Amino acid sequence: FTCFTTPSDTSETCPIGNNICYEKRWSGHGMQIEKGCVASCPSFESHYKFLLCCRIENCNQ
């Protein structure tokens, strides 16, 4: 299973069991973006502008 990850913003193989891609964005010294693989979707926090969780390879491109 592969997802885009930061800071490289390239598609990488996820560790076993981490089969959810995510992307979260928030403001702080400009727009901050974090992408990666997780076992469960992160909780939405009030400072986030955007949170995406998906189970299709590279869906967080």
Swiss-Prot record:
Keyword Secreted: yes
GO molecular function, one term: toxin activity
Organism taxonomic ancestry: Eukaryota, Metazoa, Chordata, Craniata, Vertebrata
Subcellular location, record wording: Secreted
Main location (coarse class): secreted
Entry protein name: Weak toxin CM-1c
GO CC annotation, single: extracellular region
Superkingdom, taxonomy of origin: Eukaryota
Tissue: Expressed by the venom gland.
